[in-house]
């Protein structure tokens, strides 16, 4: 729980706008037909990263705290911490641009095509005015 609080503090670090084409999705809706100009924001990324870093901590709170301290004190932690912070910033950005549901393909932080993680299909729907 303290770890989540620690990570939430990194949400206030400035985040650069993600111009271009961005697929907002999760592991159950993999992106398709990505272009060189497109990028992916994994909305389940923070949880998946934390799970991969911390694994299954012990049920005993004292032992779990010790395990977490060992991870946080490891030489790999600064890089892992930055990865988690970046993943949270991307999720916050999705919320800031008003993303209502996912998967979605967002063009220039303005136009969203919901219900697909396929960049080509989203571009076609967008060019047809959503018809």
Question: What role is predicted for each listed range?
Answer:
Residues 18-58, 107:
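Local sequence-structure signature of Cys/Sec-based thiol-disulfide redox active-site neighborhoods
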Residues 102-113:
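A short, hydrophobic beta-strand/beta-hairpin element that forms part of a small beta-sheet core
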Residues 115-131:
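C-terminal partner/receptor-binding element of secreted or periplasmic proteins
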Residues 76-100:
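Thioredoxin-like thiol-disulfide oxidoreductase module
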Residues 2-11:
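Sec-dependent signal peptide recognition
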Residues 14-16:
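N-terminal signal peptide c-region/cleavage motif recognized by signal peptidases
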Residues 55-85:
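Aromatic- and Gly/Pro-rich amphipathic surface segment
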Residues 32-33, 113-115:
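Extracytoplasmic/secreted cell-surface and envelope-processing proteins
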């Amino acid at each position: 729980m303290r770890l989540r609080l620690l990570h939430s503090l990194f949400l206030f670090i400035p985040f650069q706008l993600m111009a271009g084409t961005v697929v907002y999705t999760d592991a159950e809706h993999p992106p398709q037909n990505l272009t060189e100009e497109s990028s992916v924001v994994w909305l389940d990324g923070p949880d998946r990263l934390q799970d991969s870093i911390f694994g299954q901590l012990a049920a005993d709170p004292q032992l779990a705290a010790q395990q977490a301290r060992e991870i946080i004190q490891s030489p790999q932690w600064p890089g892992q911490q930055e990865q988690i912070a970046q993943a949270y910033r991307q999720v916050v950005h999705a919320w800031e641009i008003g993303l209502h549901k996912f998967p979605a393909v967002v063009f220039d932080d303005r136009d969203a095509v919901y219900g697909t993680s396929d960049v080509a299909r989203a571009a076609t729907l967008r060019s047809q005015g959503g018809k």
